[in-house]
Amino acid sequence: MERKHLEAYKEAKSFKGFEVWWHSVQMTLKMYITTFLIVFFLHLFLTFIFIFLFRFDDLKLVFLAFTTFSPHLWIKAVFYLVKISILFFILCSPVWLAFPIFLKKYKVKAEKITRDEHLRGAKVVSEDELKQIIEKDLKEKKGLLTIGKIPVPPMAETRHFFIIGRSGTGKTRLIYSFISQLRERRAKVIVYDFKGDFISCFYDPSVDLIFNPLDRRTIHWCVLREIETFADVDSISMSLIPSSTRDDKFWVDAARDVFSSILFYLKYTKQETNHHLWHYCSLSEEDMLNQMIIAVNQGVEIAKRALGYLLGYEKGSKVASDVLSTMRQYTNCFFYTSHLKNEFSLKQWLEEGEGFLFIVGFPRLRDTLRPLLSLFIDVAIKHTLSLSEAPERRIFFILDEFSTLQKLSAVLFALEQGRSKGLSLVLALQDFNQLERIYHESAFSILNNCSTIISFALNDPKSQEVMSRVFGEAEILETDETLAMGVEDTRDGLSLVRRRRLEKVILPAEFAYLKDLQA
């Protein structure tokens, strides 16, 4: 019953519309009449003031005439008084220009008190406003990266970029723009081109390099060339075989130990080729056990760690098989590099090279090549972090379809510490779930360490919610209008109440309705 009563109360009755209209008419008439009277009395007041100031002596004579007993002087005095009053009334008539000014003031005041007022927190501004804000603090405007019309301050380049949006919304177009601008700057750039979109447009064989073992133009790179110290061995193992969940931590650590033993043994015995690397990574359990025994006998102490996992093989233990199976998930990629020579040094190119280095994916072998391409990028990032301090240096890593790479051990450290090395990361992906699936709780740290965040349209509710939180909240002072109605006109009234409200700058659902190329 209460619900029916409430619905009946909310029904659109005609008298409600009448009350709103009639109240509006009354308030409008009241405004015009009151304003008219204010201006009219102001007109009269100014007229008397001007007469008093400029015809004071004449007023004395007029009043003296009224003190006599000559009626004909009274008539002349009244006529003269009316004459100068009309004259000054006309001269003061411009005061009526205040009438529309008053109306304009009312309008401005109404807009001010009814408009939500931003108190603090995040704020949405137009593209032109943001451009003006940024350019105000820029000393040099030439050669800057731009996002649409918006310039990117030089110091923001090394604070990294995070680009997110569903397929086909404009991420690739934005990266095209970045690469084109960086080409004009002759910057040093490493581009992860999973789909091959960028190499077809920007590859210049005179200055650029390609890494893709299935491309005849590829550089001849061997990971063994990047090893200079014992610490490099473990670092490369971590790059190739990423950390995983606690449930399989043992198998990951064991696989890393075996791979580290292989690397160290190859380096120790001067077998620094991709052919030898693939040969030892593909050994059977029995052959791997025998090889580790040989390595230990030759003084390779690190091989003892691998030997501990393999010794049980002869007794029927499955540990050796499981460890090698885990390792081969990541080392099978070396089959595709076994024909490559050991000619290219990533570290040397980062220190002395120029141009672009394209790391090109091959979708048909996505899962097989993922560890190799991830290893290459992770090693490149670590080498960049080992360079001397040089904030003015710029080395860009543009990683499109970032989620197609496996977990990079150095990416979070690069985001936090890369600024002093001149390192700039551009990470692009389709939704936040992809990032969280790979990096787990570190996904939010990656996002938080990117100062320039660009979001295109998103369909995934989790991604929408995360991006809404990233763009922040604002404290708003809003005005609520309340219209009271009654049978008697005296009961009608409009009240305005101002109160503070906390709201999200961008609602999660708004991301779903962004148009293509709109961010």
Stretch-by-stretch model annotation:
Residues 143-148, 340-341, 437:
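Short gly/ser/thr-rich secondary-structure transition/capping motifs
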Residues 2-4, 36, 154-157, 161-423, ...:
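P-loop NTPase motor domains
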Residues 227-231, 415-519:
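Conserved ATP-driven motor cores of ASCE-family P-loop NTPases powering translocation/secretion/packaging/pilus
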Residues 115-121, 125-127, 164, 192, ...:
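Generic beta-strand/beta-sheet core signal
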Residues 148, 187, 212, 270, ...:
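Glycine-centered flexibility motif
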Residues 1-190, 199-206, 268-269, 294-298, ...:
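Accessory regions of macromolecular translocation/handling assemblies
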